[in-house]
Amino acid sequence: MSEAHDTNGNGNDPRAGLTRRGLLGGAVAVGAGVAAGGDPAAAAPAARAPGQGHLPGTEQGPGREQEAGRGRVPRLWREFTQRPYTHPQIPYIGRAGCRGGAERFPHHPRVLDVRAFGARADGATDAAPAINRAIAAAGRAGGGTVTLPPGTFRIDDVIRVGHSNVVLRGAGSGRTTLYATRSLTELIGVYGSRYGGDKSSWSWAGGLVWLAPEARWNSLVAAIRARAWPFEGWTGNRRDAWRTLTRVAPALQGSWTVTVTDPAGLRAGALVLLRLSDDPAHTLLEHMAGGGPGPEAYVWDDKTKLTSYVPYEWPVRIARVHGRRVTLERPLPLDVRPEWDPQLTTHVQELTGSGVEGLTLEAVQTPQQPHLLDKGYNGVVLQCAYDCWVDDVTVRHVDNGFGLVAASACTLRRTRVAGRGSHHPYFCREGSHDNLVEDFTIEERTVPGRPDTQLHGVNVEGLSSYNVWSRGEMRMGTFDSHRGMPFADVRTDITLNNNGRHGGDGSAGPLFGARFTHWNIRVVNGRAGLVRIDGLAPYSATVGIDEVTEFDQIDVPDFTGDLHARLELYGAPDAVRPRNLHEAQRGL
């Protein structure tokens, strides 16, 4: 397909012929609208500062790509800069990650050395009790950094980070190792599925290093041990641990400010949930899919797993309260309509300001189990976490690598999955939003996979939205859109050996909602599946990918009719400018 066949794209890399200064200057008008408490989408068309010239891609006429150094700027990028918060195909993900994607993580000056609590780096003595004592002490003190010196620490239990502002820091992923000897099945118990069957939920949940609020973790484990298979998110095991703070007036996707009925329970800096409930006609789900004849014709009622994921719960921090006008730290992910009973609500106590850094978690090497029967030799999981992070961490010989479970605004940076092979190297589920996974690597497996296992890759599901995977090297796996209609997610600047398969139960509904974007993807084995998505994903953008063909797992679109998807710079990933969509959007 020629580059002129316009079916969508996005991106911008200030290191690739475009300067961050130019991007920032061009976004002054947008920023001014936010600072004034107005709707930034209204300010976006004026996104040009005096003396700074045009934003990249805004000068050329329709249907032409502007030259930028040796590369080309797609029409889609020019369009996006004119309406960054409301573009129909490209989501705004410029504030994804911890503290809006900040380059530096918070520093906690109080330091606790695990050796002072009895931990020994001899590879033989169980250090988990001492490490957990040190973490708990930091939590009781209001926060701190728990340090692990170089060496190997055997752990026979889960390492739990359950208090805010606590960081577990090793001496580097090549110097400090946690050697895990037992699975989550052994440590906590059998974990069945709330949807029935004989599946093990350890196949997609839980970690041997587990960051979750202490009370939420305790309630979750109690439910598992009682075999009352729980929901895992922000409103408790039965999704009833919340109360209304205020109703919200109608507003449009991309608005930073909403009007509320009663601001008395709101304050700047507080974390709240925006709760949107579906109506009997499933117009909320249709909206997530982009609306129009295709989603309207889709049969939603029998997608019982998908319908169990609503209400949609979006955690967001309040930036300012001015009378009944409430400004949020991120723009609205969806429209707010009366038929969806929009509310700001409470939630379980979050984990915030906590992280894990500079270590390797290595599980004892065991044979991989059949698909969906994992024992739970899992890596690092963030759950009910907001503004948390993982940096310079490797997991080895795990069933499932790094997990985001009802986690939002978190960053995984410089992470690596290695060893005998895994089921989900990365998973993002149960309504996880606004997360950033960057500088990540999935190594080739060291043990051949058995025929009854399945490799996914970078997973996203369960109405998870506005997440980003950036600057990745995937030596195996795929872009695992795992049904459950995730939407508005971005994969950018990734090299991929596309040899994995997606999963997802048919009752979980569509593979994709609206506004998925794949931008600058280098496919080394030429396989199209789940990378070229202009024939699958509604209102999507596929920009700057290698030429690919369909083989192995081949999908058909879930929605009928025109998908309103777009394809640009097909076959030219090296030419697309900007090269990295997330980095480019951070300039806006």
Describe each region flagged by the PLM.
Residues 165, 174, 352-363, 386-397, ...:
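Right-handed parallel beta-helix
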Residues 472, 492-588:
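Catalytic domains of carbohydrate-active enzymes that cleave complex glycans
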Residues 405:
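Aromatic-lined, polymer-binding surfaces characteristic
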Residues 2-149, 154-369, 543-588:
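Extracellular "leader-to-stem" segments immediately downstream of a signal peptide or signal-anchor
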Residues 184-226, 337-346, 370-381, 397-399, ...:
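Extracellular beta-strand/beta-solenoid scaffold signature
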Residues 271-275, 315, 379-381, 389, ...:
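Ordered hydrophobic segments in well-structured contexts
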Residues 160-163, 371-372, 484, 533:
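Short, glycine/charged-enriched secondary-structure capping and boundary segments
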Residues 148-157, 376-379, 398-400:
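Conserved short loop/turn motifs at secondary-structure junctions
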